[in-house]
Amino acid sequence: MCQAARSGVFVSPDQYPAQEPFTAIGAKYHDEVLRRGRDVHGIEIAYGADPYQAITIVPSDNPNGDVFIALHGGGWTNGYKEWMLFMAPALNAQGIPFVSAGYRLAPLHVFPAGYHDVLDGVAAVHGKIAQYGGKPNRTFIGGHSAGGHLAALAALRDDWMKPRNLPADVIRGALPISGSYNVGEGSGFSMRPRFLGAPDSGAEQAASPINHIRSDAPPFFVAWGEKDFPHLCKQSEEFVAALRAAGIEAESIVLPGCNHATASYETADPHGHWVPAASRWMREH
């Protein structure tokens, strides 16, 4: 595993391999989150040979030990770890070292490639975060949209820690935002997500977090926008109910007035609904 570190790095999207063309909504989101995070700098650590296989750590000046790993959205076909850097200042102010983790994208890399990248990114954080004020046993994972899906899947599946020499409780808790928890039948998607690969791959079952709920899973703090995509609101409600039915502690928050994009922006507002609640939740767990 490659783990070369570079300090004070902001990698431009122009330095990455080409992605699928953005939708109009995606292009607007891309421009906005890069604008919001343009002054945030951190330490970049590669965990693989592909440019997308890297994490950026933004330390807190007064770390309390909690660590938050953020995974970007983009429909599994778009996005950069730099998208999430705008979240760092508000969480840093709460004493939380912030990590944004990149992963390879579809359609070139279909499931489970990007998911496995996320797991390797968690392993890199576990091995490095103590140098930056974080406690490896206080690692929380979250993300927006597709990133929320990947965070939930990593928290629920328990077949990946041992091969990476990680403790079974390496994930302290999960905080997905506007995520997808069912990518198969009944998901509400207008078309089959491209990251699943060929229709006969059977990936829907393996890739759906709701299929991996286990009674000893870590706790969840699930958020979504009041005006989010209807199928994601429904999925979020059903996911929280399923977690609770399995005996897993699950807190939820509906972000007032937020649509899919502004739910993401809300996670960087120190005086908004998400940052104070999520920071408190991490401290308590």
Predicted regions and their residues:
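Short amphipathic alpha-helix adjacent to the substrate-entry channel of hydrolases
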Residues: Y80-S100
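Conserved alpha/beta-hydrolase "acid-adjacent" motif
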Residues: F229-E238
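Short beta-strand/loop motif that positions the catalytic acidic residue
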Residues: D216, V222-W224
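Short beta-strand element of the alpha/beta-hydrolase
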Residues: G65-G75
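Primarily recognizes the serine-hydrolase "nucleophile elbow" in alpha/beta-hydrolase
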Residues: D120-G188, E204
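C-terminal catalytic histidine-bearing segment of alpha/beta-hydrolase fold enzymes
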Residues: A223, E237-V240, R244-H285
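Mobile cap/lid helix-loop segments that gate and shape the active-site cleft of serine hydrolases
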Residues: L34, G179-H212, P218
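N-terminal cap/lid segment of alpha/beta-hydrolase-fold proteins
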Residues: A4-N62
